[in-house]
Amino acid sequence: MRSVSSAGGGSTYNSDNADSLLLAFQSTLDLIADEASTMVSPGVAVNQSQRFQHLDEMYFSLFKPLQNSFWNGNLKRYRVGIQGGEATFYDAAGSNAMSGSDFSASARSWWSRSVDGADIMLGGARDRLQTSSRRLYYTAAPGGSLRQFDLNDFTNAQLLLPPEATDAVRTNVANELLNMWGDPLHSRPLMVNYGGTGSGENFVEDNIVFVSTNAGMLHAIDTSNGDEKFAFMPYEFISKASSYTVNRLPLAGGNKRQTYGLDGSWSVLRVPGATIQDAPEKVMIYGGMRRGGNSYFALDVTNVTSPELAWQISGSTGDFVDMGQTWSTPKVALFPGRVPVVIFGGGYSPADHDDHKERRSQDEKGNAIYVVNALTGELVWSAGSRNANVQETVPEMTHSIPGSIAVVDVDADGVVDHLYFADLGGQLFRADIDGSASANHKVELLAQLGGTGENHRRFYEQPTVSYVREGNKSIYYVSLASGYRSHPLDVDTQDALFVLRDQVPFGGAEQTVATLTDFTNVSTGAEPDTTKRGWYMPLNKAEGEKSLSSPAVFNYEVLFTTYSPRSAADDESDPCSVSYGQSYLHRVDLLTGEGERSTLLQPGLPPGVTVLFGENNETAIVVGTETVSADSPDDDDDDDDEPNVRSLRQGRWMQLTPDGAGAIKQP
């Protein structure tokens, strides 16, 4: 494998005294460089006319940190070309858009009227608001119907303005609401197809990309020209409009932001039309708030110029009393009875993990999973440890579950059979979904991989499930990596990558709960013991190394990124040196754990891995704005000794008829 980069890209602040060192550190804004940055994987979509490859369009969520709680953001589009197993990003003029891991100063992204380079205030979807007016929809109460914004409908109090606020101040609030772009810090762009024109090689897709920001808005962008079709701002944020516009709050103590918004990623339910040219019969999208709050929103965007709020679910009430901050990206699937559902974890509990490094016996919020009807939002099934609040009581579900849920369909009938999820107590679970009329769903604790002290491992992200055929055995390999996302500077925890073998879904014998002793430590050079439950690899090559995203599995490899707060500075011997830290890409064999680690150019917290599929079976691996060869380190033509490995993808609900089966559309 070619090296991802030849040198580290860490940024360092030097100081000759403790006071100025503190100021220098605070200016790093939680390890995010003071430049155009991205912390989520780029948005990509499947080609509707060539279902086994991606479109050549890449969408980057970009932001620039400021010395207050409001950060500016943008969405930019580039073209991606794959050749020789590596990807290249091109600008609108056809030139290489990158200089190292940064956007070239001479690059002009799609939709931009002039060169915009790495400046997030120029070009992109943000720039298009200069030439088109924003259609802003809001809810006047939680869960209320959508209304189009009109300043005359609001009192000063409804905008969080003082009674004496003048008309000029009110106008400034309105102007900001109709023009601002906040930071899409954790929101990965979601592209949805709305049909198209032409056929074959001349087929031109009509696509919309959705992304949300910490300014409290969801944006729907026409990919052909960058124009905004609409923006949505729920009551929870428009009722505090002054905080996002004319009275932006400073950073609080400890360099913490005080203002968040719709910072989650979105998922889609899409019912296709009769042909790929036809508009879909139904499009609904689902997303949460992360640190912005404890609600999920479902929008009917079948008519993208006239969205409707289908439903809103909020934590701490009714069936969702245990739900915390909504970090888990919803998964759309079919439940038994072919009921379209949305599946998500119980969320994040800031009271238990923001300021408490010790392991608690039970988190206040988030220690549950939920399955709701995708069309109505009504609860279908839930599981957790508090029996009065959930349908299935699982005493071991004591810690919050901010990650997404891995959805598995064993028999390829389109209906969920198993769910895999992990929690902030270092535990891994599997839910077995009963397809019979009794609907006797159950949850099994598979592994306890956390503990106290240096073993207090937290799983913030979704496990990755791969199907492996070993001789006459079918096995699921479940990959997950730990890391204290809420405290990336932590150096006290021994984090690790774990790969667990699970044969129970294929009729294997039930197993006891696995602990660390049931896994082979492959960092010692030992071969995985097939009599054990799996293997693990301590992240100990750099101090405080941790993983902050889900692994990807491709070509018999587990690919995942890590971050170390201490390893980037060449002058670490200088006690007055503070670094952004260093990010890495790991590529290890799924079955044996053998592999290598490469240094990434981009400083700070890295996004996860994206595997791109292009024309002529070309593939490439992308990490944020960097690319690496998709060839395995030990790639050769003789793979007779390799078992059959297939990485499982989440199911999506598609309404199919026998004559329409060839027209499946998947965003």
Where are these predicted regions, by residue range?
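A fold-level detector for beta-propeller and closely related beta-sheet-rich head/sensor domains
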Residues: M1-P667
